[in-house]
Amino acid sequence: MEPTEKTKLLEQIEQWNSKDEYSRCIWVIEAIPEQERGYLLTVKLSRAYSNLAVLGDHREHGTDGEVDGNLIQHAIELLESVRFRGENDPYWNARMGYSCLMAYCSASTAYKYAKRWLTLAPKDPDAQKLVRDCEGYLEEEKALEI
């Protein structure tokens, strides 16, 4: 894929994502052979699966709290496939943190990635929020154990 084509594709994916059209993102990215996708498109594909699992297209899941376990697990598998490249990338850690939080209904795994994200991007307010959220969830989990 030519660099200008890839740039246009990434812009289009961002537009679809902002319009909650996650299935469109998935269809377009998966039409590209896996060996040609590269790191960034793989992470974007994971994001689309994660968002579809939690929110659904056009937020059809609303606020019901239902998560499609198969889709969120696939999102994590995609991230795992590029772990070597992503471990030091704030965006990869963000996606892994959010996906793990939704997949496991436990903050302990997500917290590890949230902390790494915050280390890599200490001024990112979203990273700060995910760390705080995970800490709150961990406190709640601990209180339930007592």
Give the location of each predicted region.
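Amphipathic alpha-helical repeat scaffolds of TPR domains
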Residues: E2-E14, Q35-H61, E87-A103, P125-K142, ...
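Short helix-adjacent coil turns
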Residues: K19-R24, C105, P122
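Alpha-helical positions within canonical tetratricopeptide repeat
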Residues: R24, R37, V67-N70, H74, ...
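Canonical positions in the second alpha-helix
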Residues: A31-I32, S81-V82, R116-W117
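Structural marker of alpha-solenoid helical repeat scaffolds
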Residues: E34-Q35, F84-R85, L120
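Short coil/linker segments at helix-helix boundaries
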Residues: S50-S81, L101-M102, T109-A110
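Internal alpha-solenoid helical repeat scaffolds
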Residues: W117-L120, P125-D126
